Amino acid sequence: MGYVDEVLAKVKEKNASEPEFLQAVEEVLESLRPVIEANEELYKKNAILERITEPDRQIMFRVPWVDDNGQVQVNRGFRVQFNNAIGPYKGGLRLHPSVNLSIIKFLGFEQVFKNSLTTLPIGGGKGGSDFDPKGKSDREIMAFCQSFMTELYKYIGADTDVPAGDIGTGAREIGFLFGQYKRIRGLYEGVLTGKGLTYGGSLARTQATGYGLLYLTNALLKDHGIDIAGKTCAVSGSGNVAIYAIEKAHQLGAKVVTCSDSTGWIYDPEGIDVALLKEVKEVKRARLTEYAAARPSAEYHAKQNGEHGVWQYKVDLALPCATQNELDIEDAKMLVANGVTSVTEGANMPTTLEATKYLQANGVLFVGGKAANAGGVATSALEMSQNSERLSWTFEEVDGKLKGIMETIYANISDAAKRYNATVGGKTDYVAGANIAGFEKVVDAMLAQGVC
């Protein structure tokens, strides 16, 4: 049994009840086989794979808070600090009923390599809670956030661990969290990113993940002699990532015809109206039924099991921007049958492993979220830089740096894949390229720092 197989067996034995984490580890280690086999003695002697798949620490805590009826509620909070070999732990806080240790570990593990790819000095971590902000009043959200930070503050800091937003954690929640940290510590420091512009936030942070996804997608297509202008796109989701991916796609001359939320999806052959979508989702916080009611060209479809949703339409580019494992093997078959050119992930691991392999085997240009959605964390790191220097850059400055970072990420993952002849379906294996490029930087730092 080789070193990779030995470590995979150990990880599966130790984390048997954590399917999301195991899926992420298996995907990464399988793609790293050529790198590890080329340096197996060195990596095995230094237990590199054992160390990189085991978090530095995982913190789980009780979060009690009082609802509007005076009833005490209790949620579970998490922070997994995975690896800080190249910088402070960095990763979002997810507030969603599905949150558990497995999901937070999978996200933290992925974050290590994603953050490495940004070319910026940030390590990997993730956190969150099974608290559901939907349907809660502002007072209830504040009560939860203050209780959550009353425990979390012990483990974070501007040079230690810098959390950010994620699903369920937007500007409102970040504000409440930052206020409580400042109140407890008496420090005004860049301990969170995604802050409001009046208290240390960065311009272009809101747009960063979606814009970055399109910058990388455009670089990918250009490298293959394809012009994004005139292409038709399917996007899933209707949160920040999806909205600004749609906006940037339109700016680049493409047309996005779908978006979705937890209850259903929109098909709009005239192209999604971004201004209307923003009004429905960012201002009214309403369902997509309101978009359809205000847009004659749009069709609304309620979500039903067994349907392909946004992936059933004939499109050139697919951009999954909703949540993990949303695009399965049947969806992948539908996309391939309809002649999709590329799939680039805006969400974290939205494509199942089986679907990923099918897309790649059928010659689809596929870039996973580790590289494709790194724009968000890259701009968070730029926010950290601005906070450290007590400066505020213009939108154009931040957006220009973001575009450069995403183009560099594409170049690096393409180069890494080619160095190890990583191909699948006759095309460059960008998933392997991302894992290799991210892994090499982290491992070099780990080896330089000794056993720690």
Task: Go through each PLM region and give its residues.
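General beta-strand structural signal in soluble alpha/beta enzymes
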Residues: 106, 160-164, 187-192, 258-261, ...
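Rossmann-like adenosine-cofactor binding region
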Residues: 264-366, 371
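Conserved active-site and cofactor/substrate-binding residues in soluble primary-metabolism enzymes
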Residues: 2, 16-23, 27, 43, ...
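Glycine/serine-rich phosphate-binding loop and adjoining beta1-alpha1 elements at the start
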Residues: 96, 115-229
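Glycine-rich phosphate/diphosphate-binding loop of Rossmann-like nucleotide-binding domains
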Residues: 193-196, 201-314
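Adenosine-phosphate binding glycine-rich loop
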Residues: 2-24, 220, 336-452
